[in-house]
Amino acid sequence: MEIGSFLELDLRDTGELFDGSEVCRLNLNRAGIYHCCRLLNVNKVLLPYYECFTVRDFLLGKGLKVDYYHIDKDFMPLDISQGDDTAIVFVNYFGLMSTEHMLSLIEGYKNVIIDNAQSLFAKPINGVYNVYSPRKFVGVPDGCYVVGPDAVRFSDEYDQDLSSETAGFLLQRIEAVSYTHLT
């Protein structure tokens, strides 16, 4: 049984967290970061060293170049050198960055992607791409929101992803809880 960042299946109709023409819905956070790179028309991405390896592997698998930058003990970027055709991913680790702090952090950079995988309720920053992963906060098997300028562009080019292949752990949690109450 998987627990980690997965919560119980939630079937309540609570509506969408993000809605509108500047919102694209995809299956995975790493797919959202790739989608942002397509929107930005870049062929290279700067990631912090402290980023999930699945993001790196996914981007490399899509033909993007990946480079890294260091962060300090407070998760702040150190010594970043960004080229013209390069996107930079800033991570809102554990939701610790306020909107004001993020605005000051991204100042002076171009092709900015904010990875809010750990910060579902962080307000999107206007003019850049914000990527969210709801499965770490609510009981859904997968999903990603990309919020930013013309975020839906290219979305019709992707195959429809179905969650039935990846949702088994949510049903196992329900069965496990039911079983423990019966015994």
Explain the meaning of each model-derived region.
Residues 2:
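PLP-dependent enzyme catalytic core of the Aspartate aminotransferase-like
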Residues 5-19, 23, 31-107, 116-120:
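PLP-dependent aminotransferase-like
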Residues 72-170:
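Active-site phosphate-binding strand-loop segment of PLP-dependent enzymes
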Residues 165, 173-178:
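Non-catalytic, alpha-helical, charged scaffold/linker segments
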Residues 180-183:
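Conserved small/polar residues in nucleotide/adenosyl-binding loops
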